[in-house]
Amino acid sequence: MNPLIQEITKSQLRSDIPSFRPGDSVRVHVRVVEGTRERIQLFEGVVIKRHGVGVSETYTVRKISSGVGVERTFPLHSPRVAKLEVTRHGRVRRAKLYYLRALRGKAARIKEARR
């Protein structure tokens, strides 16, 4: 890779991101701009996948809101994400937890890991 591109991407990487894996429950604090105002919106759910490497790395969080499953994908190093908190470490044996889309209620629970 071009050294100039490497230098630019290295400056864009965030260092305040906690380590998390698919199956972990996270709370994402997202900066939302509405007109001239900016506020923080929380999105709390289970990480169902991580994808990519470096600046372009993303993760998808799934939650159930009013009985409807909502998935939202965030860039890992985005300045729009104010804070990322890991609330629980889950124990799963897959990298992509797409099977959770078909499960409801207690069947969609994930065991807690001892980390």
Swiss-Prot record:
UniProt keyword annotation of Ribonucleoprotein present: yes
Keyword check for rRNA-binding: no
Pfam family, any one: Ribosomal_L19
GO CC term, one of those recorded: cytosolic large ribosomal subunit
PROSITE patterns (alphabetical): RIBOSOMAL_L19
GO molecular function per UniProt: structural constituent of ribosome
Keywords recorded for this protein, A-Z: Ribonucleoprotein, Ribosomal protein
Name under which the protein is recorded: Large ribosomal subunit protein bL19
Species, as recorded: Latilactobacillus sakei subsp. sakei (strain 23K) (Lactobacillus sakei subsp. sakei)
Lineage, top ranks: Bacteria, Bacillati, Bacillota, Bacilli, Lactobacillales
UniProt gene name: rplS
